[in-house]
Amino acid sequence: MKTQRDSPSLGRWSLVLLLLGLVMPLAIVAQVLSYQEAVLRAIDGINQRSSDANLYRLLDLDPRPTMDGDPDTPKPVSFTVKETVCPRTTQKSPEDCDFKEDGLVKRCVGTVILNQARDSFDISCDKDNRRSARLGNFFRKVKEKIGGGLKKVGQKIKDFLGNLVPRTAS
């Protein structure tokens, strides 16, 4: 009488289960997004929710902060997007679109989850005022330098004219 232990099908099933056990962790690891991939997905979501006419594309990604290894923990992100020439209704990827000259720039901050199965993000974007502030600082510095230079020139003219006045002999 044969037992199940002697059955060749039991050996095959054991081998199949062993192989599945080895392959499954690899499948789980493959579902974890990189930091940049998670940000690009978040930008896709931003483009879908946007009421603006054109798509936005990643302009600048801030360095990745140190993170724990848990892909289900929200990770902080900050990046800048810029308006492209592609209308929001296009089927093109934003990466295939050129930036719009003088397009709107937005600063985005929030969190993403790297687990591809959860595909979750919480991002808010505001018009990037840093560029305007930098331009304002530039003009203020130019004004200060010109103003300071004009004062010096004015003082030198005064001194020069003061030396031209004839001196009376006592």
From Swiss-Prot:
PROSITE patterns: CATHELICIDINS_1, CATHELICIDINS_2. It is found in: Secreted; Vesicle. One of its GO terms (cellular component) is vesicle. The keyword Secreted applies. Keywords: Antibiotic, Antimicrobial, Cleavage on pair of basic residues, Disulfide bond, Immunity, Innate immunity, Secreted, Signal. The keyword Secreted applies. Proteolytically cleaved by proteinase PRTN3 into antibacterial peptide LL-37. Proteolytically cleaved by cathepsin CTSG and neutrophil elastase ELANE. It holds the Pfam family Cathelicidins. InterPro entries: Cathelicidin-like, Cathelicidin_CS, Cathlecidin_C, Cystatin_sf. Residues 150-162 are annotated as: Active core. One of its GO terms (molecular function) is lipopolysaccharide binding. Residues 1-30 form the signal peptide. Disulfide bonds join 86-97, 108-125. GO terms for biological process: antimicrobial humoral immune response mediated by antimicrobial peptide; defense response to Gram-negative bacterium; defense response to Gram-positive bacterium; innate immune response; neutrophil activation. Residues 31-131 form a propeptide. The cathelin-like domain (CLD), which is the propeptide part, does not seem to exhibit auto-inhibitory function, as it does not inhibit the antibacterial activity of antibacterial peptide LL-37. Antimicrobial protein that is an integral component of the innate immune system. Binds to bacterial lipopolysaccharides (LPS). Acts via neutrophil N-formyl peptide receptors to enhance the release of CXCL2. Postsecretory processing generates multiple cathelicidin antimicrobial peptides with various lengths which act as a topical antimicrobial defense in sweat on skin. The unprocessed precursor form, cathelicidin antimicrobial peptide, inhibits the growth of Gram-negative E.coli and E.aerogenes with efficiencies comparable to that of the mature peptide LL-37 (in vitro). Belongs to the cathelicidin family. This is Cathelicidin antimicrobial peptide. It comes from Macaca fascicularis.
